[in-house]
Amino acid sequence: MSKRPADIVISTPASKVRRKLNFNSPFKSAAAVPTVRVTRRRTWVNRPMYRKPMMYRLFRSPDVPRGCEGPCKVQSYEQRHDVAHVGKVLCVSDVTRGTGITHRTGKRFCIKSIYVLGKIWMDDNIKTRNHTNTVMFFLVRDRRPYGTPKDFGQVFNMYDNEPSTATVKNDMRDGFQVIKKWSATVTGGQYASKEQAIINRFYKIYNHCTYNHQEAAKYENHTENALLLYMACTHASNPVYATLKIRIYFYDSIQN
């Protein structure tokens, strides 16, 4: 049986180009959509672990950040905060110099990740009012810390003093960088009330902090890259409370 000529197949309007669909490899199908510098490593980064090849399951990225040395150290900040409409700031890179598992050995260390755990809640007098209150959280890197941490209104520019529209001021964008941003909402009232909201956030940030020669864990002893957590609620007259446990996981630098 003779085959059809190749030119007839191409010129026929009803003919379609048959392709072999391969759903196993996102790297081969990445050529269909033009992307910027698609590497084989990046194509598998957003896949679940059971769908990755064996090579990407066994050989993972190193746990210790570049330029640092183990072991992984932990520092916790546990406090109840009164979050107001004007905002509040908390320094989460205060680490004392020492030899323990919660201390820094020298001036430099790298905060690899941060874990924010807790809840926001209202007291009994406020939760009976019909309102909705959202707490905005901003994890900010202060590249050039000096003196005391700046207030929320000094760093962020807001429209009509509304924290939900907060962006870093134009003259502050070089010194203050928002690393992560999230929010949590509580609702008060007699019906359909939600008096508390759980906060469970884990982020990899790789923030390289630098201290001066002082040993105390203070903001004023930072010289580079202090880590600040800004909080502000959207309701002007009804405050909200935040009970948080913040843990940072850091490694000492080999330059110490």
Curated annotation (Swiss-Prot):
Keywords: Capsid protein, DNA-binding, Host nucleus, Metal-binding, T=1 icosahedral capsid protein, Viral penetration into host nucleus, Virion, Virus entry into host cell, Zinc, Zinc-finger. GO terms for molecular function: DNA binding; structural molecule activity; zinc ion binding. Pfam families: Gemini_coat (PF00844). A motif (Nuclear localization signal) lies at residues 40-54. A motif (Nuclear export signal) lies at residues 101-122. GO terms for biological process: symbiont entry into host cell; viral penetration into host nucleus. A zinc finger (unnamed) spans 68-85. The keyword Hydrolase does not apply. It comes from the Viruses. It is found in: Virion; Host nucleus. InterPro entries: Gem_coat_AR1, GV_A/BR1_coat, Viral_coat. The keyword Magnesium does not apply. A motif (Bipartite nuclear localization signal) lies at residues 3-20, 200-247. One of its GO terms (cellular component) is host cell nucleus. Belongs to the geminiviridae capsid protein family. Homomultimer. Binds to single-stranded and double-stranded viral DNA. Interacts (via nuclear localization signals) with host importin alpha-1a. Encapsidates the viral genome into characteristic twinned ('geminate') particles. Binds the genomic viral ssDNA and shuttles it into and out of the cell nucleus. Plays a role in protection of the genome from degradation, virus acquisition and transmission by insect vectors, infectivity, and systemic movement. The CP of monopartite geminiviruses is absolutely essential for virus movement. This is Capsid protein. It comes from Tomato leaf curl virus (strain Australia).
